[in-house]
Amino acid sequence: MSGADKPKQFLELGGEAIICHVIDKFEATTCVDGIVVVCVESWLDYLRQLLAQKNYHKVLATIAGGATGQESIFNGLSYIERNELVAKDTVVLVHDGVRPLIDCETITACANSARNYGPTATVAPATETIVTVDGGRVVAVTERSKCRLARAPQGFNFNELYNAHMRALDEGRHDFIDSISMMSEYGYEVFVVDGPEENIKITTPRDFLTFKGFVDLKEYEQIWR
């Protein structure tokens, strides 16, 4: 099996898979009571063997994902609904298995915002100018100070998110890039919390090197405290 064949969440740094770096953060966050991990079906056995080596107490289930991110999230929500794992008004957080540089403080802030206000996205400031193009021409320039990069985790009332996904299914909508986009489309006011700038999604070799750089930096800072 080559590295190119392996899903990115299973790439390792310091002897630990990226997905485990992610779960470690949620496992350590006090307000998180349970974790459902959604995974490419053909890699479920590999994931379960990986997690069996860890002493996780909050991982409730590992289940198969779908053909799209939207379908994978719905599979996770459906599992929770079917097995009555949470009350209808419970806050649920949706996170990427390849976004390991999240921290407990941001996870908690996102959960609190979702509980107190409504659907919440973790964001980071846009550091470059955002333009809209059409036919090779710039047709709009958005004021950078008002732009944010939508990231994860994203927090929701479980019942509201589940019902929105059911509505999308009924309408044959399979094109939502994330659940925040879905909730906004269906009329919900969406709130934001600031997350760490390094909270990137690892999708390229350069992203992985950035991840390694931040991990090395944190280790260096601990040594020289």
Region locations from a protein language model:
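Conserved beta-loop-beta/alpha segment of the NTase-like Rossmann-fold superfamily
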Residues: 67-133, 151
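Residue-level signal for inorganic ion chemistry
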Residues: 10, 19, 76, 96, ...
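Short aromatic/basic micro-patch
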Residues: 12, 101, 141, 155, ...
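Short, flexible, basic/aromatic active-site loop/helix in glycosyltransferases
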Residues: 132-156
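Conserved donor nucleotide-binding strand/loop of the catalytic core
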Residues: 55-69
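N-terminal glycine-rich phosphate-binding loop and ensuing alpha1 helix
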Residues: 1-44
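Conserved alpha/beta core of the MobA/IspD/sugar-nucleotide pyrophosphorylase nucleotidyltransferase superfamily
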Residues: 148-225
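Short helix-capping segments at alpha-helix termini
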Residues: 29-31, 52-59
